[in-house]
Amino acid sequence: MHKLAALLFGSTLFVHCALAQSQRFIIDDDEFLDKIVATGTSLLKHGKLQSVDSLRAQVRTKGVPLKLAPTSQQKFSPPDLCDRLRESTLAVGSLYKCPDCGEWHFNSSAGFVVAQGSVVCTCCHVILAQDENVQESYLLAADATGHVYPVQSVLAADTVSDTCFVKIDAPHLKPLPLRVGIRAGERVYCLSHPGGYHFMFTEGLVSRVNRRRDDALDSDGQTNGFLTRPILFLNVTAEFAPGSSGAPIVDESANVVAQVSSITDAGEPTPGDENNSPSPSVPVRFCTAAEEILRLTDPNLEKAAALETRAKSKGPHPGGKSKNGR
């Protein structure tokens, strides 16, 4: 794969040949997690990890200028696309000390390299989610080989779109380009870690492009009577589940068109309406569009975001009960 990096800007034929000769990738989830925990605890003993609490304090709306990879025109077959995504997709999550057994565990979500220089894109809630019973946790990223990279800092974030950039030390990892403007009906692919089943590859279609607003929160995390600005989302039929937050949704050229955010079970009864039986549930998968990720490269994002709330409407929000894809 190191040779492949030098060929990506050369002949399309050579790229396909190099990928075709790749060995089949086989993941052992137990070995993968054991390696992360062993490496993570060793790094902790040497003072190389940042606590989740310290990183959580850095998650505020801010942008950072980045040099992004150019949009790709290279077409990949699905197996080759999976290989390409695995070079840039990470397991991102917390190494935590279990309050029940006292052992260390790794709780994985996802992220992907978005810019050369070790910049990883993931969801804000991957960092912000808290378990009151866990007293000690540290944020890590791991590639498909199980190599562990401590998350050093939060470079940029937009809590409204639930998207952030974090810094690791892995300059050799290849970034995925962003692509805006995808339409409903286009085919997309996802590489994620649903339920701890790492590096699962799925495909589907963009079923809808939509905008959604949510209740705006004040500095104490309470609703303040306003709605957020409208956030651009894609609904996709490519399957993912909790454990997939932050995973890339890409086109056939490995351009990131969105990032996994949350899942809604359409068809559930209205909360508090226990008299009606739930209708058959259909998972509706929400992914934050690449346009929202691109906003994080605006160094003036904090000022712009302050002007984008509007008076809260009186109508109910459409949709069912949402849960994070984490």
Residue ranges with predicted function:
Residues E87-W104, C164-P175, F199-N300:
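Active-site region of chymotrypsin-like
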Residues A6-H16:
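Bacterial N-terminal signal peptides
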Residues V134-Y138, D143-S153, A184-V188, F199-D220:
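Beta-strand/loop subdomains of soluble extracytoplasmic proteins
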Residues S22-T61, H198, V256-R326:
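C-terminal cap/linker of serine protease catalytic domains
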Residues S108, A115-T159, A184, P271-D273:
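Catalytic-histidine neighborhood of serine endopeptidases
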Residues C123-H125, H193, S262:
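Short, surface-exposed secondary-structure boundary micro-motifs
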Residues Q73-P79, T89, L95-C123, Y149-P150, ...:
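A conserved glycine-rich beta-strand in the N-terminal activation segment of trypsin-fold
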Residues D80-L81, Q130-D131, Q152-L155, K167-F201:
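Active-site substrate-binding loop(s) of clan PA
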